[in-house]
Amino acid sequence: MNRSPSTSGLLPLPGTPSSSWALYRARLSNMFRNTDVSVVIAFWLFGLINNILYVLVLSAAQDLVGTSVPKGAVLLADVLPSFLTKLVAPYFIHRVPYSVRIAVFVALSCAGMLVVAAAPVEGAVGVKLLGVVLASLSSGGGELSFLGLTHYYGHGSLAAWGSGTGGAGLVGAGLYVVLTGWIGLGVRGSLLVGALLPSVMVVAFWGILPRGPLKGWKGGYERVAEPGEEEDGEEGFEDVPAGAASAGLLAPGPSVAATAYTHHHEGRTGRASFWGNVRRARALFFPYMLPLLLVYVAEYTINQGVAPTLLFPLDQSPFSEFREYYPFYGFLYQLGVFISRSSTPFIRIHHLYLPSFLQVANLVLLTLHAVLNFIPSVYLVFVVIFWEGLLGGAVYVNTFAEIMENVPAEDREFSLGATSVSDSGGICIAGFLGMAMEVWLCRWQVSQGRDYCRRIEAS
């Protein structure tokens, strides 16, 4: 059966040779007409709650730990367990039913919140970091599981998940400020409120999400027939014409994964051996994992190592204090992420390396400015930071959209979960790079007579 982006439920980039506005509107209308609203709502909530807890626990843990522990240690406690979970779990988690997984993740999330909240305000750093670790385990396991779950519910579920994860950054950053500042609950009270949030995932999975697609689950990675596929459904990369991917301006030629999956195909039993999954993961590295890893290394190095030093004289900015720069950069970044992670129903990017390399260019540009101070206005930096968020969100959601579209159905569930290790791996690498770069860049700026980064600490 021949499939292309034009028939997969994903839209080409407007203005490309294979698209017209009339055709584009027709496809868009068809996509939403065939989308189950309950699926969209459930996956949007999955993405929101799974990621908002990550943001909320990190913010609260930093406040509770105070100055006794470097921020980098808290960051690594929040990222490393998630990375290790995504690295290991795809090879055995397929034996655990989704209902059991979600129950465990909800319990871990609640426990993480409660452990951090119950720890004494002074000291008990190890206990607080334990709470962060529990929340990180839940976040990592949740991401790879919910991405795998989109295999059963189609492209609409993936778009909703991506939008929810993008919204989590904005909502999470604002929620902690509202709870601690506006409402005045304090750190502990805010965490206790946060411990209730995982119940939303319970409602979404058992109360909102249609369970029909999961009724045939047999305790392994499952193949789901494509809409309109014939019973004998001989699907694979061999059946996709070489020009099928050309429906978007950024589309590459035949997928790099095509040959790999042709050679490493394990059959259509729906269950895969450990070594079969290892071969699948190797086939995913260059077409999907590497561009996602690159974009995360670049953007989180910017966020953690470079952005804190992108400071201008206050009379040349809209701010009254130097410490106001970084939160606003974070807001612009999260806004860009939310927009681009919500964009796959409208715009698709097929060549994942292009935005990844553009993100690396952003890192180089902003690092050079931190050293040489050549960008004349902070408003230009605002544009670059917003662009950074757009690129990062676009690579994330389009990576999984490409897997959904190009990887054979019998390999897709594993591939969606296994590829998620790249984002946590990129954050871990960037965490180490960022700690070193922030210190070095600040020292360099002070030596050049620009001591703005030191004034943040004094604020």
From Swiss-Prot:
Q: Please, which domain of life does this record's source organism belong to?
A: Eukaryota
Q: What does this protein do?
A: Involved in vacuolar transport and vacuole pH homeostasis. Also required for cytokinesis.
- Identify the keywords attached in UniProt to this record, alphabetized: Amino-acid transport, Membrane, Transmembrane, Transmembrane helix, Transport, Vacuole
For this record, an example GO cellular component is: fungal-type vacuole
Q: Which gene encodes it?
A: BTN1
Q: What is this protein called?
A: Protein BTN1
| Short name of any one Pfam family annotated for the protein | CLN3
Give compartment(s).
Vacuole membrane
SUPFAM superfamilies per record: MFS general substrate transporter
Main subcellular localisation: membrane
Q: Which residues cross the membrane?
A: 37-57, 73-93, 102-122, 129-149, 167-187, 189-209, 240-260, 283-303, 325-342, 352-372, 374-394
Give membrane topology per the record: Multi-pass membrane protein
Q: Which family does it belong to?
A: Belongs to the battenin family.
Q: Which GO terms of type biological process are on file?
A: L-arginine transmembrane transport; lysine transport; regulation of intracellular pH
